[in-house]
């Protein structure tokens, strides 16, 4: 199964040069969502939709690859936190991989790093086979 991509937040974000995209791919036991660009109030809807869809469909492990993500504001953080709770209630989990320093710093400052399992990269995460 190849990756499926969702870009932008409506016509404005897509017309604005596609500042943010979410690519979904199934790998091993995980759904991998790769975030690219700038995640903020204006671009966040595709991430919210992807996370809600995969939690609703019963994904036990959602790995969010933040490697290509250059910026994340409080909107993106809140979406991830809400999705983490929804996944946990459904018997699954959301993990993060590849956070670059500016994004990692926001997680540290807010304390959100303490509630997510974080990995240096996707391959390291996929090699960790802890149960959901």
Which role fits each region the language model picked out?
Residues 1-9:
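N-terminal acidic, proline/glycine-rich, low-complexity intrinsically disordered segments
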Residues 4, 14-49:
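STAS-typified acidic loop motif
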Residues 27-28, 67, 123:
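Conserved catalytic submotifs in the C-terminal HATPase_c
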Residues 40-116:
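Amphipathic alpha-helical interaction surfaces in cytosolic regulatory modules
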Residues 45, 123-124:
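Acidic phosphotransfer microenvironment of two-component signaling modules
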Residues 99, 122-123:
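Short, ordered loop/turn segments at secondary-structure junctions
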Residues 117-121:
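Short acidic-hydrophobic, aromatic-tinged amphipathic segments that line or gate anion-handling sites
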Residues 129-132:
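A short, charged, amphipathic alpha-helix used as a generic interaction element across diverse proteins
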